[in-house]
Amino acid sequence: VNLKLKISAVLLVSAMVAAPAFAQGSGASDYSAKCAMCHGADGLSNSPAGKALGAKSLKDPAVVKATDAALTATIKNGKGKMPAFSGKLSDAQIKGVLAYVRALQKK
């Protein structure tokens, strides 16, 4: 019985550690599919489309300081030339993209 309990505990901890990594992984693929064309793979908005549209760098201090709620609203509703993604990404996908953006900002 002790062995079963230890195995269960290890599996539970493994699942808890893997869940955020999976969310970031799916956020990365959604970012690549929907955001990188303008904001670039690195978030600096140095892509041709990003430069042409004047896309804001995701590492801009104003973007870094923005709350998660504000950035979620921007992703959902669009802003300026950025299109809205509320009908194109689920809330879970938007949350994953935001987590990925926050990770990019730390690089």
Regions found by a protein language model. Give the residues of each.
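C-terminal capping alpha-helices of c-type cytochrome domains
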Residues: 74-75, 86-107
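Short, glycine/charged-enriched secondary-structure capping and boundary segments
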Residues: 12, 51-54, 73, 97
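Electron-transfer interface patches adjacent to heme c in soluble/periplasmic c-type cytochromes
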Residues: 56-69, 85-94
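Electrostatic cytochrome c docking/interface patches
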Residues: 15-32, 46, 64, 70
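Short Fe-S-cluster ligation motifs
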Residues: 64-80
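Post-cleavage N-terminal segment of exported redox proteins
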Residues: 1-24, 100-107
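Periplasmic/extracellular electron-transfer cofactor-ligation site
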Residues: 25-54, 79-83, 103-107
